[in-house]
Structure formats: structure tokens, C-alpha cells
């Protein structure tokens, strides 16, 4: 075997740049072979000449949509392409990290070596194998792939222009040309993270809105993702003449506004989507929804929220006439979901950007093979910063930044902050100062727009150095600031908790998992894949890698087992009496079911029915019905002939109930408020107790206590509690005494340092004291500092309290004895939500306008939402001074949405009175 000549290093080369690592002998290698991914396509051979046309997509039709086919269809799953041929071999070059991270990071990424996937070199010459792309398959000639069949040509061109797309991936063209999808059959898209599933969802929703003239619902897991998607879809409003409506947090009306001439795409969280489905069924308007798209479909097995997702899908399957499209990258038991949703499955292993997974144990790198084995890939140089950076994170960033970016997933919030500070201190000066001026201007803009005009001092210094941390302890504004700075290239490294993996999309070149833990729990297979999938996103990088740092020993053993294990099955969340009872109550109130047999019919459309035997299902349904009756949520009218013919029915531990089932006033109230029945039982008892004993009106403290959520908990500062207790008026001390919180108890707690649990009256009273400070217009930053809690936690608690107050108000609408709460709580909600001058409140309904910015606009003459909606973006930038043109356009677009909603609500009222409104125009 011929060997390539060895290049010797001359001493002159070293003297030219004393900061460069000392080069060692390295073997020259031939250029790397192409690794371009080609989508493995399913081949469908025609059975007969007459059947060959079945593969051709139908032309665009503007007729009414076909009814969904209820029968289960055989799934045609695109087979995952196996790797073909030997792996591509990479010969590592040799170098040494001189003077730790500072010297190595001095090197520019312009000299990045493709042979070195870590941005570093190994000390030995072990072979490093890289994942090889599958060989292309020949596409069947009988299959005509034309995604324009999904949308009219003009609209498809407009979509490509907005999304800046040259062409679709092969699998996207194939999927959008699938006859089953175009015929309205339900579909599950199972593809890797970053494969481009979102494009399919957007095109299908546009097809439903433009071609079939029906609304669509996009269900997303988190509020932050909904807000991000609203911004991404905003250009569709003017381009396609549709409405994009947000249903998250405190946004969204029930029932939705009846639009004139336009159809809507509702972008909603799981909870809001369920309430939206309920309101449409109540109004008899569910047929207006032609499509429900669910992102992260695997969350159907995620406990409480999974139960809500399963319920909304079951109700839509049972009574709706539209199409369901579910998307996920981690669905192990996909056949169960296929059965439950009456869907076919489209699956491929295509990923547009190559992803390589590594595990770092000590100073040795291992590559993760397809079957989960760890193959030694080489040794890293000595970690010269081991005393301050024992995990060697700085080594893994050395040649990556500032040209590329990285996300470091840490086990907890405190660890995020510590790692971010470490990296910020260790970065070379030329990297820290590279964009300091731009970062400083960016932060000044943020602070001028922020009502508190303050930011965490540590976070601010990190951002100025090109590093940041991101976790739930930050406020929403701080998190958005970090995300915006990252997208503008001012931040190179983000240290985050695991929630970011399923949250906001931050495209990075490298993902580093600092420890295989989430809090105190071990990292699961699905979580690991989700984190790793964040590396190397299409349109931003040509490749990506994930490096997990593991300790040798027990941690290494179970991590190896996790890599080789299967993803846990996605199990139904309706398997308990609590969750099944909630579903049954919804069905009864919505008049979807009036007896056991009709309830059993509704359950047939759930994942639970696909995973459990009919006998166990009936047993759970009957016990859940009995439980609802015992808690007075429903009433049962047994049929006389059945009672006479079955005298032994009462002797049964779980009786068969043959009569009509109706909701009680309490059941209607629970449904109207969107409460869980178990939660409502405790809440109802507390509300009755408060009203019977009398609400203390000397201040708003008692009302704030009533709306304090049960699930919130924090550490108690008993010394502060005693000071605040002594400062309370006698009327408020009376309330604390009724809840068992007297001065004697506080004094004992100061000594014993007792911890309070979530939901107890004492804990809720302590949280109510924080809400009272905010009610009195104290800045949130100051309140959080005084009580020793995180600003992000306090903000989340405030928002949860506002939602709780709104829900209690709806709850009170159905129970006549609670009329005082129905009258008092709406004002409380408004004041807690805005806490501003009354004249500024209308302006603050616009996204991007808070109290400080609203005051500037009001002073400049923008006194109504309509004036902002008609504003010139350039003039708006000049008036505010601290915003960019993109922000100005976003504010104007949001103002137009608010104005549109207000006008449509008035038009809806005029339509009821028979007033002609066809000639009206918004602007």
C-alpha cells in the first residue's frame, strides 16, 4: 500500500505566528466523498395498467371537501433506507492546544479543517468514521410529483417567495403529491428533527384555506412556539387574504370571531385548541374547521397535557368532518396512533443536514453508531483549563466560535448560569470585543422598551461577551432578548435547560450536552434525540454534531444502555378515572353522549381504545361515570324498566347505568371554566367557604388570595413573612388567622424553618402577598428581589393567577350563588394584566408595545390602535428611536390584527341586527 508523503514542519512557520498551535506530523488525505442526502422514496408498482393513474395527484378543486373516510386504511410507510457501502474514513490531523482555550480560540474558523468534527485535533491516529448518506433510489416513472397540485400555481409561487425556497426536497414533493393526503385522509408524518415537516403543514393549511375555504387549527405545545409561529405566518395574511389568529396565554376569543369573507388559521396551544374545539361544537360550527395539524404528536402520551390533546383529537374525529395531520420525530408505537387517528403513515429517514453524534468520556471521543454502539474516535489534547473547566467544554468550542454557534444543555438553571459565566470569562479578548458595540446598542434598545428598565446584571455581562443563558428563571422579555440577540449573531453560545430542546428553535452548528441529566432525572432516549436534533439546521449549516459529556463508571454504563434502548411507547393518558372522567364530562356537556353506550362510542376515537381491551375500557368508563355522579358533576336518570328487570344492580360494586346522563350546574361550570374535575372539587369548596365567611373588601388582598393558583410553590422567607404580617391591617390578619397563619405559627416557623407544600392556604397566602405588591405597582424586579424568588417564576405565577381569575369568573357564570365573583374578577384581571394608565391600555393590546413604549407613542400622537395600524414604518422608527424597521413592521402588523378583530366583532353584532356590512373595508 502506497503511503502519502509526510509534510515536515519548518521552524520558520512556527515563528510567523507564535499564537498558533504547534503543528505536528499529519498525513495528507484524498478529498472527502460526497455526503449529500437523497430522500429514499417509496416505490409503488402499478397492479394493472388501469390502476397506474391512482398515483397521479388530483387537480385542484374548489368544491366542498370530501367527508373523512372512517374506515382504517392500510399504512404505506416509506421504508427507512439502510446504509449502503462501506463507511467514509477520516484520518485525523494532529495538533496541540497551546495555552488552553485562549490560544486555540485565537485561530480563525476560516482555517477550519473538515477532517476535525470537533474543531480540535486528536493526539492519536485512530480512524474516525462518519455517518454515510444512503444511496439514492430510482423514482418510479409512473409517479408524477408536482406539489403545485396542492395549491394553485400562483399561490404556490407566492409561498415559495415568502419562504425564500428554490425547490422542495424530494420527499416533500412526494408527500404533497400523495393522493391519499390530497383526498383528505388523515396522515401521520414521522421524520427526523429538521427534515422539513413544517413546510408540509403550512402548505396543507393554505390549501384548506385557499382552495377549500375552511379554517385550520395548528396545535403547538408551548406558548413561546405559538408566538414564534404567529410571527412566521404573519406575511400570509396579506399575501393570501387569510387571518392568522393566536390562541395562547390570554389571547383568543371563545367562540372565535365570525369572519366576513375570510377564513382563519388558528395557531393554538394544546389547552386553547381544546377549548376552541369545545366552543365550535357548542355553537354547531365544527364543520367550519377543515384541518387540525398537531406538531409534536408524541406529547399525546405526556400525562395531563397529553390527556387534553387526546381528548381534542377524539372529539374532532367523532364529530368533525376535517382532516388530521400529526407530526413527530419520536413515535415508537406508531401503529397505535395510526389505528386511533384512522390515518396512514408517511415516514422517511431524510435529514437535509448531516448529523454526527459523539460521546466524550474523559479525554476520549467516541462516535455513536447507528445501533447505539460507541466506537473510539480519538483522544483530545490535554485540558489545560481543568481546574476551572473540568468537563473540557471550552476545548469543544475552541475552533467553533465566532464563525459558528452552539447550544449547551445543562441539568439545571444554576448550572446554566455558571457555565455561561465560565465561558464568558475564558473567551479571548478579541472574541469578547468583536461585537460589543452592537451588543451594547441592542441591550440599550431592550432596556428602553422594558417597563422595569432592568436586566439581570450577570446576563447582561454575558451577552456583551457573546454568551447567554436561557431558562425559566428569566422573564419572557429576557428570554426573547436572548433569542433575538442569538438570531442576529450577537451571541455565539447559549447555555440552556432541556426545555429549550422542545421550545424555541435556535439553529446551531453544535449541541453539547453537559451531563445526561434533566434536573435529578436521567436523560431519556426521546429527550436525547430531541436535543441532538437541534444541531445542524437546514438553511443555516451544512453539517452538525452533538457531543454528550459522560463520566466513566455507572453513568457511562446506563448511558450506553439508553443509546441501545428503544424509545418508550407512547401510552394513552385516558387510563385513569380522573382523565377519563374529564373526557366523559366534556362529552356529556357537549351533548356528544347521553348514556354509557354513546360514551363508549366516543371513546372508540381515542388512543386508549387502541391500546386497551373492550372489557377494561367499559369498566373504566362505568367507574368514571360513578365518580362524576358522586361528586355532583352529572345526574343520572335510570330507566324504569331497567331498574325493575335488574333488581341486583345496586349490589354491584360498579353498577351499569342504563339511564340518561345530564350535566349538573356544577358540571356545566367546570366545563365552562375549562377546569379539571378534581381541581374543580377543591376550588368549589374553597370558593363556597370564602363567600360564606364573607369576602374582606377593605383591600384587594382577599380577592388576590382567591385567584392564587394551587400548583405554585416557592421557598418561604419567614423573617420577611413576619415583618409583612406585622404591617398588615387587622382585616387582612383576620384572613390569615382563618387559614391557620397566626403570628405564633410564623415565630415557630422562623426557628424550625418548616417548608410549606403547594396548594396549602398558607403557601397561597404568601404568594398572594407578592401579588399584592405587584397590584400596588411595585416593579416585578423589585418584588422578586425582596421575596428571594426568580423573576421568571414570579411572572409565570402572575400570568397563572390572571388565567385562574378569568376561569373562576367563567365558573361563576354557571352558579348563581357566586354572582359576586362574576362581578368583581373581570376588573381584577384587567388591572393585573396591564397595571398601567387607562389611556395606554388600548395601545398595549398590540404585540411589542408595553407601558414604556405605549407612553412614547401616546405622547407622539398615536392615541388609538387604528393610528398605529395606518402608520408609516419609517416614521414609527423615528418616533420610537430604539427599534429596527423589522420591529416597526411587526408592530404595525399586530395593530392591524387587533383592529381587524375589533371591527369583525362589531360586524358580527351588526349581522345579528340585519345590517348590511358587505361593502366595509378595514383600512
Curated annotation (Swiss-Prot):
* UniProt main location, coarse: nucleus
Domain of life assignment: Eukaryota
Q: Which residues form the Helicase C-terminal domain?
A: 392-596
Localization (cell): Nucleus; Chromosome
The answer to whether keyword Calcium applies is no
* Sequence segments annotated as region (Disordered): 1-84
Q: What are the alphabetically sorted keywords of the record? A: ATP-binding, Chromosome, DNA damage, DNA repair, DNA-binding, Helicase, Hydrolase, Isomerase, Nucleotide-binding, Nucleus
Q: Which GO terms describe its biological process?
A: DNA double-strand break processing involved in repair via single-strand annealing; double-strand break repair via alternative nonhomologous end joining; double-strand break repair via synthesis-dependent strand annealing; resolution of meiotic recombination intermediates
State its Enzyme Commission number(s). Answer: 5.6.2.4
Q: Where does ATP bind?
A: 191-198
Question: What top-level class of enzyme does the UniProt entry assign?
Answer: isomerase
Location of the Helicase ATP-binding domain: 178-349
Role according to the record: Single-stranded 3'-5' DNA helicase that plays a key role in homology-driven double-strand break (DSB) repair. Involved in different DSB repair mechanisms that are guided by annealing of extensive stretches of complementary bases at break ends, such as microhomology-mediated end-joining (MMEJ), single-strand annealing (SSA) or synthesis-dependent strand annealing (SDSA).
Q: What is this protein called?
A: Helicase POLQ-like
Q: What is the lineage of its organism?
A: Eukaryota, Metazoa, Ecdysozoa, Nematoda, Chromadorea
Amino acid at each position: 500500500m502506497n503511503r502519502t508523503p509526510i509534510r515536515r514542519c519548518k521552524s520558520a512557520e512556527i515563528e510567523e505566528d507564535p499564537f498558533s498551535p504547534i503543528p505536528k506530523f499529519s498525513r495528507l488525505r484524498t478529498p472527502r466523498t460526497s455526503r449529500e442526502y437523497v430522500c429514499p422514496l417509496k416505490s409503488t408498482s402499478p397492479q394493472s395498467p388501469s390502476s397506474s393513474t391512482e398515483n397521479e395527484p388530483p387537480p385542484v378543486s374548489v368544491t366542498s371537501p370530501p367527508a373523512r373516510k372512517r374506515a382504517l386504511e392500510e399504512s404505506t410507510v416509506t421504508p427507512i433506507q439502510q446504509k449502503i457501502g462501506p463507511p467514509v474514513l477520516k484520518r485525523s490531523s494532529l495538533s496541540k492546544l497551546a495555552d488552553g482555550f485562549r490560544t486555540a480560540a485565537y485561530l480563525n474558523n476560516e482555517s477550519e479543517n473538515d477532517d476535525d468534527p470537533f474543531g480540535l485535533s486528536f493526539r492519536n491516529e485512530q480512524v474516525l468514521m462518519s455517518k454515510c448518506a444512503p444511496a439514492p433510489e430510482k423514482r418510479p416513472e409512473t409517479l408524477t410529483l408536482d406539489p403545485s397540485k396542492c395549491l394553485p400555481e400562483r399561490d404556490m409561487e407566492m409561498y415559495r417567495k415568502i419562504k425564500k425556497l428554490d425547490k422542495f426536497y424530494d420527499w416533500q414533493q412526494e408527500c404533497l403529491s400523495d393522493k391519499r393526503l390530497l383526498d383528505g385522509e388523515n396522515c401521520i408524518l414521522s421524520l427526523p428533527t429538521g427534515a422539513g415537516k413544517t413546510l408540509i403543514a403550512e402548505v396543507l393549511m393554505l390549501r384548506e384555506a385557499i382552495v377549500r375555504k375552511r379554517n385550520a387549527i395548528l396545535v403547538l405545545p408551548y406558548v413561546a412556539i405559538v408566538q414564534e409561529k404567529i410571527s412566521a405566518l404573519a406575511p400570509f395574511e396579506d399575501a393570501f387574504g387569510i387571518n392568522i389568529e393566536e390562541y395562547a396565554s390570554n389571547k383568543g376569543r371563545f367562540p372565535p370571531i365570525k369572519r366576513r369573507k375570510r377564513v382563519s388559521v388558528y395557531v393554538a396551544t394544546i389547552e386553547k385548541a381544546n377549548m376552541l374545539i369545545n366552543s365550535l361544537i357548542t355553537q354547531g360550527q365544527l364543520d367550519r374547521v377543515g384541518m387540525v395539524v398537531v406538531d409534536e404528536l408524541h406529547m399525546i402520551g405526556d400525562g395531563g397535557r397529553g390527556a387534553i390533546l387526546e381528548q381534542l383529537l377524539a372529539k374532532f374525529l367523532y364529530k368533525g368532518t376535517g382532516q388530521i395531520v400529526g407530526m413527530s420525530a419520536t413515535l415508537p408505537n406508531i401503529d397505535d396512533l395510526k389505528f386511533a387517528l384512522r390515518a396512514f403513515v408517511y415516514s422517511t429517514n431524510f435529514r437535509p443536514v448531516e448529523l454526527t453524534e459523539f460521546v466524550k468520556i474523559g479525554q476520549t471521543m467516541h462516535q455513536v453508531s447507528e445501533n447505539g454502539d460507541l466506537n473510539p474516535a480519538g483522544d483530545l489534547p490535554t485540558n489545560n483549563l481543568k481546574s476551572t473547566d473540568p468537563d473540557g467544554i471550552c476545548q469543544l468550542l475552541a475552533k467553533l466560535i465566532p464563525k459558528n454557534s452552539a447550544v449547551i444543555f445543562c441539568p439545571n438553571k444554576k448550572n446554566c448560569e455558571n457555565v455561561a459565566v465560565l465561558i464568558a470569562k475564558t473567551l479571548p479578548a478579541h472574541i469578547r470585543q468583536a461585537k460589543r458595540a452592537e451588543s451594547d446598542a441592542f441591550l440599550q434598545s431592550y432596556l428602553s422598551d422594558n417597563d422595569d428598565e432592568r436586566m439581570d446584571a450577570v446576563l447582561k455581562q454575558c451577552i456583551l461577551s457573546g454568551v447567554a443563558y436561557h431558562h425559566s428563571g428569566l422573564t419572557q422579555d429576557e428570554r426573547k432578548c436572548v433569542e433575538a440577540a442569538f438570531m442576529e449573531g450577537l451571541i455565539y453560545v447559549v447555555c440552556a435547560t432541556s426545555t429549550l430542546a422542545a421550545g424555541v428553535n435556535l439553529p446551531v452548528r453544535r449541541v453539547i450536552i453537559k451531563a445526561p441529566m434533566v434536573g435529578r432525572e436521567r436523560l431519556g432516549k426521546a429527550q436525547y434525540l430531541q436535543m441532538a436534533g437541534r444541531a445542524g439546521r437546514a438553511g443555516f449549516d451544512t453539517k452538525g454534531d452533538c457531543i454528550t459529556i459522560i463520566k466513566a463508571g455507572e453513568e457511562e454504563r446506563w448511558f450506553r444502555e439508553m443509546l441501545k434502548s428503544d424509545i418508550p411507547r407512547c401510552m394513552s393518558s385516558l387510563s385513569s378515572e380522573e382523565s377519563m372522567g374529564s373526557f366523559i364530562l366534556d362529552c356529556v356537556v357537549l351533548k356528544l353522549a347521553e348514556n354509557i353506550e354513546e360514551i363508549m362510542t366516543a371513546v372508540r376515537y381515542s388512543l386508549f381504545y387502541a391500546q386497551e381491551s373492550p372489557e377494561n375500557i367499559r369498566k373504566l368508563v362505568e367507574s368514571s361515570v360513578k365518580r362524576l355522579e358522586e361528586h355532583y358533576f352529572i345526574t343520572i336518570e335510570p330507566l324504569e324498566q331497567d331498574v325493575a328487570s335488574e333488581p341486583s344492580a345496586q349490589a354491584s360494586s360498579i353498577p351499569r347505568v342504563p339511564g340518561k346522563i345530564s350535566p349538573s350546574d356544577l358540571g356545566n361550570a367546570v366545563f365552562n371554566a375549562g377546569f379539571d374535575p378534581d381541581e374543580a372539587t377543591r376550588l368549589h369548596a374553597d370558593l363556597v367557604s370564602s363567600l360564606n365567611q364573607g369576602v374582606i373588601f377593605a383591600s384587594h388582598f382577599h380577592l388576590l388570595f382567591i385567584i392564587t393558583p394551587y400548583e405554585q410553590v416557592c421557598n418561604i422567607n419567614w423573617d420577611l413573612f413576619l415583618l409583612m404580617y406585622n404591617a398588615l391591617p387587622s382585616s387582612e390578619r383576620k384572613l390569615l388567622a382563618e387559614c391557620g397563619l397566626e403570628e405564633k405559627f410564623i415565630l415557630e416557623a422562623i426557628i424550625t424553618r418548616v417548608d410549606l407544600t403547594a396548594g396549602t392556604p398558607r403557601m397561597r397566602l404568601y404568594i398572594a402577598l407578592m401579588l399584592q405588591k405587584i397590584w400596588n405597582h411595585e416593579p416585578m424586579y423589585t418584588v422578586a428581589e425582596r421575596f428571594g424568588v426568580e423573576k421568571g417564576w414570579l411572572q409565570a405565577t402572575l400570568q397563572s393567577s390572571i388565567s385562574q381569575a378569568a376561569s373562576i369568573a367563567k365558573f361563576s357564570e354557571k352558579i348563581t350563588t357566586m354572582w359576586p365573583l362574576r362581578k368583581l374578577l373581570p376588573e381584577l384581571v384587567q388591572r393585573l394584566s396591564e397595571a398601567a394608565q387607562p389611556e395606554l391600555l388600548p395601545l398595549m393590546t398590540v404585540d411589542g408595545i408595553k407601558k414604556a413604549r405605549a407612553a412614547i407613542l401616546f405622547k407622539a400622537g398615536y392615541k388609538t390602535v387604528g393610528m398605529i395600524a395606518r402608520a408609516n414604518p419609517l416614521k414609527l422608527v423615528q418616533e420610537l428611536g430604539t427599534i429596527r424597521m423589522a420591529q416597526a413592521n411587526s408592530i404595525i402588523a399586530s395593530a392591524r390584527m387587533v383592529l381587524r378583530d375589533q371591527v369583525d366583532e362589531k360586524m358580527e353584532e351588526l349581522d345579528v341586527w340585519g345590517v348590511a356590512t358587505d361593502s366595509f373595508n378595514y383600512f
